[in-house]
Swiss-Prot record:
Domain OBG-type G: 160-329
One Gene Ontology biological process: ribosome biogenesis
GO molecular function: GTP binding; GTPase activity; magnesium ion binding
UniProt KW Ubl conjugation keyword: no
Cofactor names: Mg(2+)
EC number annotated for this UniProt entry: 3.6.5.-
Species whose genome carries this gene: Desulfatibacillum aliphaticivorans
Gene: obg
UniProt name for this protein: GTPase Obg
Assembly, per entry: Monomer.
Residues the record lists as binding Mg(2+): S173, T193
Free-text function comment from the UniProt entry: An essential GTPase which binds GTP, GDP and possibly (p)ppGpp with moderate affinity, with high nucleotide exchange rates and a fairly low GTP hydrolysis rate. Plays a role in control of the cell cycle, stress response, ribosome biogenesis and in those bacteria that undergo differentiation, in morphogenesis control.
Length: 336
């Protein structure tokens, strides 16, 4: 299924039902009073967060939704049936904005969390409601209130514990495949991954760890280059970043070039991203040039802790997994 992380919806709640004009008609009561019931309330439009969906793809072709209107009132003081609420499922991690003002209406970050985005119209009053000591036979009733209509902008931010970041072709897809059961597209050319993918790493002593493979960032991503804004926003909720570097591409002229480029983009987008804890990992240690590149990087990075792995061969992964669990178990690293 194609990953879609933005969608625009037009939603409308149900109109209230019309009140009824009716008079009591029974044997031996020739002049029964008014008995018109009220109309029913229109249905609300409710967004519901669910982990059963991981993308906004289901809104690609259907983007207009309307809740049920309220039923009409009837005689014998019978009220109209309330319209059913319309429940629209969205993935956990969806931010709901008013498309016209960009104001955030809701941040649905918890399973089964709900938000009423449009309230149904109130039902109209039947003619019985308008009787008085001086007006005993009103021959009119009230129309139901119109429902609300809104245009919503949905933005999905993945809820993952760990985010994999790095330049294109650093080996992020190979790493998430090696660590989890995820199966993203893998290739020996930049931008193989065009959308985030998720995998789950089982912690034998704690909760499962969700890892997100974030598509490769490029210079200018913080300003939107290469769909940078859409990729970077998925990192905002990560508790830990794995900063992956292709060791075979480290050069003597500027050993820290790729490392500094990614950190610059993170900080430019949001200072908080640049301050997130990172595990720096040199990948592709199976390639001939990687050993020299790793030495150059370590000589230039000072006291920075660096791990070396080969995602393709599975080398060094046990140490990386231990480092991930150790970081996430630290106080204050649990999700709020």
């Amino acid at each position: 299924m194609k990953f879609v992380d933005e969608a625009t919806l037009i939603v409308q709640s149900g109109d209230g039902g019309r009140g009824c004009v009716s008079f009591r008609r029974e044997r031996f009561i020739p002049r029964g009073g008014p008995d018109g019931g009220n109309g029913g309330k229109g249905g609300d439009v409710v967004l519901v967060a669910t982990r059963a969906k991981h993308t906004l793809y289901h809104f690609r072709y259907k983007h207009r939704f309307q809740a049920q209107r309220g039923g009409y009132g009837s005689g014998a003081n019978r009220h109209g049936k309330n319209g059913e609420d319309l429940l629209i499922e969205v993935p956990v991690g969806t931010i709901v904005r008013d498309a016209e003002t960009s104001e955030i209406i809701a941040d649905l970050s918890v399973e089964e969390e709900r938000c009423i985005v449009c309230h149904g119209g109130r039902g109209g009053k039947g003619n019985k409601h308008f009787t008085s000591s001086t007006y005993r036979a009103p021959r009119f009733a009230q129309d139901g209130e119109e429902g609300e209509e809104k245009t919503l902008k949905l933005e999905l931010k993945l809820l993952a514990d760990v985010g994999l970041v790095g330049l294109p072709n650093a080996g992020k897809s190979s790493l998430i495949t090696a660590l989890t059961a995820a199966r993203p597209k893998i290739g020996a050319y930049p931008f193989t991954t065009l959308a985030p993918s998720l995998g789950v790493l089982q912690d034998p002593y704690g909760e499962p760890v969700v890892i997100a493979d974030i598509p490769g960032l490029i210079e200018g991503a913080a300003q939107g280059a290469g769909l940078g804004h859409r990729f970077l926003r998925h990192i905002e909720r990560n508790r830990l970043l794995i900063h992956l570097i292709d060791a075979s591409q480290v050069t003597a002229e500027d050993p820290l070039a790729s490392y500094q480029a990614i950190n610059k983009e993170l900080s430019s987008y949001d200072q908080a991203l640049g301050e997130k804890p990172q595990i720096v990992v040199l990948n592709k240690m199976d390639l001939p040039e990687a050993e020299e590149g790793a030495c150059l990087f370590k000589q230039s990075c000072g006291n920075l802790q660096v791990l070396q792995i080969s995602a393709i061969l599975g080398e060094g992964l046990d140490e990386l997994i231990e480092a991930i669990f150790a970081q996430l178990r630290e106080p204050g690293r649990r999700p709020s």
